[in-house]
């Protein structure tokens, strides 16, 4: 369903000009900020309490000024309710006006996003199997990357920070530099971010996940051009797989952000 054969690679991800799903255009039709005339980045998050949703928001927030400079308007849509959205924004720093919620996964399904593993026994056995890498491509290797470090990924903490996970005693971030160096993602650095996120979610589970029927539902990313054509789409297939380039989750935006710098 290509409207054009124009394409170019971004870190091994091929961008094509495609038709935007009607379900997405219908969802944003009444939102003035999402009107045609500007590029729009629409992120379909999973459950508000999903680790992918947390990490995706934490990747987006520091880049909001660059998105604005590039003329790209952002909208995130997650599964949950307003109480969960309020807490999510307070924790991640996501501006509340950029996040909307859906009570179920109907929009995700209409956009052909993966429902995740559907194992006998319901969503909880399915989620546990996905966490073990079953029916969830790339999950185990991504978990491991959080512990081993990644020289192709950016540093997560400044040396002067004191990291509180809510589980361990406060950690001086300078320990990561002494243990692994600086200027890249050090061993255990990303795992510490994930531990902090996990503690926040588990302590407030019912707020973040008011309906656990959709805990395996996966998300997706849609970048729309000013004429509503689709510049980029990514549909994730597994837990901790919200980007095709997890070491730099927003690498697909490089052609537009770098041009605006």
What spans do the regions from the language model cover?
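Thiol-based oxidoreductase modules, predominantly thioredoxin-like and allied folds used
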Residues: 69-84, 96-104
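Thiol/selenol-based redox catalytic cores and closely related redox-interacting motifs
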Residues: 102-238
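N-terminal chloroplast transit peptides
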Residues: 1-3, 7
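A short, polar/charged loop-to-alpha-helix boundary motif
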Residues: 237-258
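Short acidic, S/G/P-rich loop/turn micro-motifs used as interaction or catalytic elements
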Residues: 48-51, 82, 238-239
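Short, surface-exposed basic-aromatic patches at helix termini and helix-loop junctions that form
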Residues: 65-66, 88-94
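Short active-site neighborhood of thiol/selenol oxidoreductases, capturing the structured segment around
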Residues: 31-67, 73-74
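A short beta-strand-turn-helix
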Residues: 10-40
């Amino acid at each position: 369903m290509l409207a054009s054969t124009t394409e170019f690679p971004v870190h091994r991800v091929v961008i094509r000009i495609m038709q935007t799903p009607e379900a997405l255009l219908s969802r944003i039709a009444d939102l003035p900020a999402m009107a045609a005339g500007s590029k729009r980045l629409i992120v379909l998050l999973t459950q508000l309490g999903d680790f992918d949703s947390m990490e995706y928001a934490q990747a987006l927030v520091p880049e909001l000024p660059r998105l604005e400079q590039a003329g790209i308007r952002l909208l995130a849509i997650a599964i949950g309710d307003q109480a969960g959205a309020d807490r999510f924004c307070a924790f991640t720093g996501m501006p509340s006006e950029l996040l909307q919620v859906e009570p179920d996964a109907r929009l995700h399904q209409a956009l052909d996003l993966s429902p995740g593993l559907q194992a006998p026994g319901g969503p909880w056995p399915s989620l546990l199997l996905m966490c073990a890498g079953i029916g969830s491509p790339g999950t185990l290797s991504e978990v491991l990357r959080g512990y081993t470090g990644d020289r192709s990924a950016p540093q997560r903490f400044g040396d002067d920070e004191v990291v509180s996970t809510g589980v361990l005693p406060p950690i001086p971030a300078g320990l990561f530099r002494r243990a692994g160096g600086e200027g890249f993602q050090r061993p255990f650095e990303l795992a510490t971010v994930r531990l902090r996120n996990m503690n926040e979610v588990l302590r407030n589970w019912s707020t973040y996940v008011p309906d656990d029927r959709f805990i395996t539902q996966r998300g997706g990313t849609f970048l729309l051009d000013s004429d509503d054509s689709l510049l980029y789409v990514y549909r994730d297939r597994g837990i901790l797989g919200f980007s095709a380039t997890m070491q730099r989750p927003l690498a697909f935006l490089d052609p537009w952000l770098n041009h605006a710098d």
